[in-house]
């Protein structure tokens, strides 16, 4: 990333009127979790070329990452006022609406994508994550199926596989191991590309199939030996998940050290969800260190603009409840469980992690 940044800075110096290096450097800073620098670069890109829809979307997305929601809306409104529009902008507008709890605006973005190849599937998959966030797994699976079908119709099997493996990871986190395993197999059969393999490995590690996860890690290390984000973020995260599967919390914590500087960044993949912090929290739970675990899970609540609408964002409430229960703070534990149950008040009743949570909460009374 540092070398990339130097390249773009040299480009900027040699071609001061070119907006492209500012766009690229801004994206680079987002991956590095240097959001204020990303804002400055993207604003400069817009000054040099004010009719680039991607720059408005990038600026708004960066403000979302920073939880600066009013600034994000202003960036999106500026784009629309200039009659600039595309699927990436609508994706970011959707995420803003989610964080504001604006169901009508979320529906508007999904409706905008209807019938637009390449946009429709993206917005349907995003909606699937929102349904899962609220525990509506039957609806989530339906939206994921529709997203995959739309991507296949648009002749993009790799994208369809991405939505499939995203759904599989969701199932893994909720305790639906069989569905997760089926989803991983289907995604890899459809299109075993780099990003799909990364999330497949993570999902497999999360459901207790560390050997298969490690095999995929080996393939990724062999095929992408110089990929910075794989080496520093994703492979350590998958390795930590595999260590947790075997109960080796010390190794998991060590594995996650590499990801630490980048865990608040966007991780250059179609998911992020602050996984290193989530897994580190689970490692501390295994280590019987409730207070340290709670601090890690709290990161997901403090950085909702990064976690967005993935299930780890809502499960963080449950994990905080578990952490405080372990630490002996029953009042805080109960409050965290209640936060989780409030968000999942209309959840499908058969979700394994929900059943576990209810049983745990009953013992707190």
Describe these PLM feature segments.
Residues 19-20, 35, 53-54, 86-88, ...:
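Helix-start (N-cap) detector for alpha-helical repeat units in TPR-like alpha-solenoids
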Residues 13, 47, 81, 115, ...:
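Structural signature of alpha-solenoid helical repeat scaffolds
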């Amino acid at each position: 990333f540092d070398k990339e940044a130097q390249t773009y800075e040299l480009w900027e110096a040699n071609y001061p009127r070119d907006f492209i290096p500012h766009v690229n450097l801004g994206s680079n800073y987002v991956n590095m979790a240097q959001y204020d620098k990303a804002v400055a670069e993207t604003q400069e890109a817009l000054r040099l070329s004010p009719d680039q829809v991607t720059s408005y979307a990038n600026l708004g997305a960066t403000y979302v990452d920073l939880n600066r929601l009013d600034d994000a809306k202003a960036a999106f409104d500026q784009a629309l006022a200039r009659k600039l529009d595309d699927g990436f902008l609508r994706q970011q507008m959707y995420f803003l609406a989610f964080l504001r709890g604006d169901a009508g605006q979320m529906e508007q973005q999904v409706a905008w994508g209807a019938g637009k190849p390449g946009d429709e599937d993206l917005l349907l998959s995003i909606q699937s994550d929102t349904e899962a966030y609220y525990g509506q797994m039957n609806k989530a699976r339906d939206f994921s199926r529709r997203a995959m079908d739309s991507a296949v119709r648009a002749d993009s099997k790799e994208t369809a596989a991405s939505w499939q493996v995203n759904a599989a990871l969701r199932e893994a986190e909720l305790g639906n191991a069989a569905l997760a395993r089926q989803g991983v197999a289907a995604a890899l059969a459809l299109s075993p590309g780099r990003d799909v393999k990364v999330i497949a490995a993570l999902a497999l590690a999360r459901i207790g199939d560390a050997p298969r996860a490690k095999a995929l890690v080996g393939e990724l290390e062999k095929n992408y030996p110089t990929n910075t984000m794989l080496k520093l973020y994703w492979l350590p995260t998958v390795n930590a998940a595999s260590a947790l599967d075997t109960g080796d919390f010390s190794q998991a914590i060590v594995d996650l050290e590499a990801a630490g500087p980048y865990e608040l960044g966007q991780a250059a993949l179609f998911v992020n969800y602050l996984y290193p912090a989530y897994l580190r929290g689970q490692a501390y739970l295994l280590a019987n260190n409730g207070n340290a675990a709670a601090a890690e899970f709290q990161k997901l609540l403090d950085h909702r603009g990064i976690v967005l609408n993935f299930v780890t964002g809502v499960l963080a409430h449950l994990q905080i409840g578990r952490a405080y229960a372990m630490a002996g703070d029953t009042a805080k534990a109960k409050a965290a469980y209640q936060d989780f149950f409030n968000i999942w008040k209309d959840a499908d009743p058969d979700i394994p992690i929900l059943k576990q949570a209810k049983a745990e909460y009953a013992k707190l009374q």
